[in-house]
């Protein structure tokens, strides 16, 4: 009986350590410590702890470290795991499509985007990614339609900048500039908005208005605005 109790205590201790490793992995991922998180999530997979979440964590770490093929493999393993909710599956398809895009596997990335469109409710992130993949495949009309859907659902400054930068990478700056102009039609609500407006004016090489926005933000205590002001002066 004593031996059995000791065995159960040791097993409980092992379970506790394994859960601690998993919790540390989640924490390290949130903090951007990708190499530590990768090692810990790998241990969690070996320990059979929250397999879908652990594989997802491995995939994100590998993607952030530039190891796109390994990231794709991890996201695929996560999708094949038991007890994957519909919400998590949608998230995993988004991540895998992104990794496939980064790896240059455009047909595979588009296949994931099509799965998202067929099986899940499309949101701004889905539409944006689908547009980005379409543009990489020179599907200009499809990309334009997807970006319009994305901005229609999330007309924030960051989204406008994302779309602009995607077009800029394809030397199609004019197509992206209209999103910057649309974003500027709204009023800034806080210092973050002022910083974003400053960034947009910089993209448009309107440094006078960029200074105005960033100066206003810095006067309200935004350290980001101070840094960006220095960049504006350096760009002139």
Model-derived regions: residue spans:
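Canonical tetratricopeptide repeat
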Residues: 57, 64, 88-95, 129, ...
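Start-of-helix register in tetratricopeptide repeats
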Residues: 19-20, 53, 60, 87-91, ...
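Register position in tetratricopeptide repeats
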Residues: 30-31, 64, 102-103, 136-137, ...
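Short coil turns that delineate tetratricopeptide repeat
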Residues: 49, 83, 87, 121, ...
């Amino acid at each position: 009986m004593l031996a059995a109790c000791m065995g159960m205590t040791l097993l409980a201790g092992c379970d506790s350590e394994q859960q601690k490793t998993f919790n540390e992995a989640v924490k390290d991922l949130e903090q951007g410590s990708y190499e530590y998180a990768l090692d810990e999530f790998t241990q969690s997979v070996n320990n059979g702890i929250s397999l879908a979440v652990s594989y997802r964590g491995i995939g994100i770490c590998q993607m952030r470290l530039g190891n796109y093929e390994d990231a794709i493999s991890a996201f695929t393993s996560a999708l094949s795991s038991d007890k994957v909710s519909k919400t998590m599956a949608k998230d995993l398809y988004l991540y895998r499509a992104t990794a496939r895009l980064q790896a240059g596997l455009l047909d595979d990335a588009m296949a994931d985007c099509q799965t998202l469109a067929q099986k899940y409710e499309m949101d701004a992130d889905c539409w944006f990614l689908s547009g980005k993949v379409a543009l990489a495949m020179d599907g200009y009309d499809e990309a334009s339609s997807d970006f319009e859907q994305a901005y229609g659902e999330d007309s924030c400054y960051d989204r406008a900048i994302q779309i602009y930068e995607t077009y800029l990478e394809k030397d199609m700056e004019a197509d992206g500039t209209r999103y910057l102009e649309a974003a500027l039609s709204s009023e800034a609500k806080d210092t973050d908005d002022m910083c974003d407006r400053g960034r947009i004016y910089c993209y448009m090489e309107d440094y006078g208005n960029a200074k105005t926005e960033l100066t206003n933000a810095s006067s309200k205590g935004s350290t980001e605005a101070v840094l960006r002001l220095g960049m504006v002066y350096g760009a002139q």
